Amino acid sequence: MEIINWLSLAMIPIIIAGILLYGTIKKVPTYESFVEGGKEGIEIAFSIIPYLVGMLVAITVFRSSGALDFIMDLLKPAFSAIGIPAEVVPLALIRPISGTAALGMTTDLIAVYGPDSFIGRLASVMQGSTDTTLYVLTVYFGAVGIKKMGDALKVGLLADLIGVVASIIIVTLLFGSA
């Protein structure tokens, strides 16, 4: 166990030293390459800010308008009828939109129901099995100038749906139902 702890502490310095050693062997100007990469990273960060602000405003309007609550109220009875706790419905809906909001919901569910409860486990697995599809598409596609993202959106939302369904099945099989 002690060797694992040592390895986990030493891994990042070992990787950095390995990259520097490899660069030196290949005669790559490692510092200059690092600085150039940093400049490119800053340029990319600045270029995605408008898309990020637009997405955050849209999320805020969606939540503040009551549209999210309306959709959740419509879906909760259907989820409850098939044995899915109504408490995780908001998480399943908000996760493709906002990672921060979804993490906040997951944290709240764990605080209320406990990490070892069915709801806590389901929320945790759901959080890890899905992605912020709309955020990813808006920010990254916007950064590279892709305007038509319809197919990517369909596939991304389908992947999120599969992640939610898989979360429910796996948590139910491993830990029993609510």
UniProtKB/Swiss-Prot annotation:
Transmembrane segments: 3-23, 42-62, 155-175
Subcellular localization(s) per the UniProt record: Cell membrane
One Gene Ontology CC term in the entry: plasma membrane
Record's function text: Involved in spore core dehydration; might be involved in the transport of something into or out of the forespore or could be required for some modification of the cortex peptidoglycan structure.
Membrane topology: Multi-pass membrane protein
Pfam families assigned: Gate
Keywords, alphabetical: Cell membrane, Membrane, Sporulation, Transmembrane, Transmembrane helix
Protein name: Spore maturation protein B
UniProt organism field: Bacillus subtilis (strain 168)
Family statement: Belongs to the SpmB family.
InterPro entries in alphabetical order: Gate_dom, SpmB
GO biological process annotation, one example: sporulation resulting in formation of a cellular spore
